[in-house]
Amino acid sequence: MVNLKELSQNEVLELINYVKSLRKQNFSYSQISKKIEIERNIKISKSTIIRWCKNSNNPFNKTKFIDLSPSPELSYIIGVYFGDANIYYRKKTGSYYFRIKVVDKDFVDVVKNSLIKIGLNPTISYVEEKTRSNRWHVEASSKSLYKFLSQNKEELFKVAEKYPEDFLRGFFDSEGYVTSNKIALENYDLELLEFSKELLKKLDVHSTIHIAKKKGTESNIRGEIYHYKDDFYRLSIHRKESVRNFAIKVSFSIKRKRERLQKLLESMDKH
């Protein structure tokens, strides 16, 4: 049996509308409760149904109501989530969080503004760390965003397809980099890279995917020896016109990455 607290924001809204429609059809409160239990395996009390029908209860009093309809900002957040960001549940406080830790202040500013745009109130902090570079943190508390991002990635892809430039910018801001001859992005998730490749293709950006590190390959990270748990993939953009189209249509939010991209274009123009 599913508890109301386990439902997403949109699922609760849909359920409220369904409850009210049943009431208009002259179902009793008890009948509505039983019908929802049988049809949807959702446990909802008679008293809650009464409050909903009389508009005397707002189920979002303790939940930030945010705009999860497709938008450039939400698409960007999804791209960031597939890269540097993570979501987690803090059991001590019973709160759900979206968080990202990065070295670039301009990056966290864009993430912060995107979170604000969809209705959240994120916080930014600067944390000094002994074992790695000091990093900026941006964090926002939202059960609705947590549940939204916890969906199958195919559902998130639907939003990304509506705003591909913003999704790709978020993903490349997180995982992308520029070398002397290419733009590249690395990730364990081959399906995610293939999806990104298709989006790039629609923007007239040719890219290729290959294995960057095979499973079991040894790596030294800050003095610690690690082994790749799975094949690690790289998506690369080499062709001059594709690099140029990427710069025009996607680019980076991060200044240092934009500067490297500009240098790559200048180098390509000389040859």
Curated annotation (Swiss-Prot):
Q: Which residues form the DOD-type homing endonuclease domain?
A: 77-205
InterPro entries to which the protein is assigned, alphabetical: Homing_endonucl, Intein_endonuc_central, LAGLIDADG_dom
Pfam families, per the entry = LAGLIDADG_3
Gene3D superfamilies, alphabetized: Homing endonucleases
Gene Ontology MF annotations: endonuclease activity
User: What name has this protein been given in UniProt?
Assistant: Uncharacterized protein MJ0398
- Biological source species: Methanocaldococcus jannaschii (strain ATCC 43067 / DSM 2661 / JAL-1 / JCM 10045 / NBRC 100440) (Methanococcus jannaschii)
